[in-house]
Each structure stands twice: as structure tokens, then as C-alpha cells.
């Protein structure tokens, strides 16, 4: 089963006052904490891919070396400013083009989500052949 992990890094941070995804936390941007864990997870599973969906050029630029290394892919989603449904849609459309059997959505503003929790969720999705799962 081909699972695409959709990493939703496109929020508007209206209440936060600035882009919370880029806010420094424990030595790196908030969005990088869970992303780095998900990249490790995807690297251990042959049929799992990591796809970052964002409306931010800076995130695309920062992730370019990881894209080049084949660790993840990115999708630019300018419509994400309209809401999370546009971000999810952009991710699912990209996953469909890659012939994914399932999509698992993770929000980038969850820096403390444990690697083992995320991996168990994904393994459970795969075992149940669930076409869509979300961790928000």
C-alpha cells in the first residue's frame, strides 16, 4: 500500500501574530520538529512518501536540499491562505498523481508529537487499508 504522508505547513497563524511555523523553538523552526521525525519514519518504509504542502516560499527554499536528496517532495499551495481544506486538497491532488493508495495528514504546528505515535498511526492506517487519516 502506497501511503503519502501529507505534511500541512501552510497555516496563516492569525492568532499567533506572526508565522508560527517559522518561529524558533529549541534551536529550529516549529515546522521542522515533526517534519524531521516524519522524514525518519518515511525513510524506514519503502512505500511511504513524505509530501510537504505549503504556501510559504521560505519553507520551499529551506527544504530544497531535502527534495534534491530524495527525502521528501514539496507542493506549493497559494490557495492555502483560504483555509486548511485548500491545503489538504492540494496535497491529495499531488498524491493522486503519484498513485498513492492512502493519504495521512499531519499539521506542522505539532512539534511535540512523538515519532512512535506518528509511526503507530501510519502503521494502523496501512494495516486497516484506510484511504485517509488525519492527526490534528
Where are these regions (language model features)?
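Nucleotide and nucleotide-moiety/phosphate-recognizing core
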Residues: 2-108, 112-136
Amino acid at each position: 500500500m502506497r501511503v503519502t504522508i501529507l505534511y500541512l505547513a501552510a497555516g496563516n497563524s492569525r492568532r499567533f501574530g506572526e508565522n508560527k511555523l517559522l518561529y524558533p523553538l529549541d534551536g529550529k523552526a516549529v515546522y521542522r520538529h515533526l517534519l524531521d521525525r516524519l522524514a525518519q519514519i518515511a525513510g524506514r518504509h519503502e512505500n511511504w512518501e513524505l509530501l510537504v504542502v505549503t504556501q510559504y516560499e521560505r519553507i520551499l527554499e529551506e527544504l530544497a536540499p531535502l527534495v534534491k536528496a530524495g527525502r521528501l517532495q514539496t507542493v506549493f499551495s497559494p490557495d492555502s491562505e483560504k483555509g486548511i481544506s485548500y491545503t489538504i486538497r492540494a496535497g491529495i491532488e499531488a498524491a493522486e498523481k503519484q498513485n498513492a493508495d492512502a493519504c495521512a495528514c499531519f499539521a506542522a504546528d505539532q512539534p511535540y508529537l512523538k515519532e512512535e505515535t506518528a509511526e503507530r498511526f501510519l502503521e494502523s492506517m496501512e494495516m486497516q487499508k484506510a484511504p485517509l487519516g488525519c492527526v490534528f
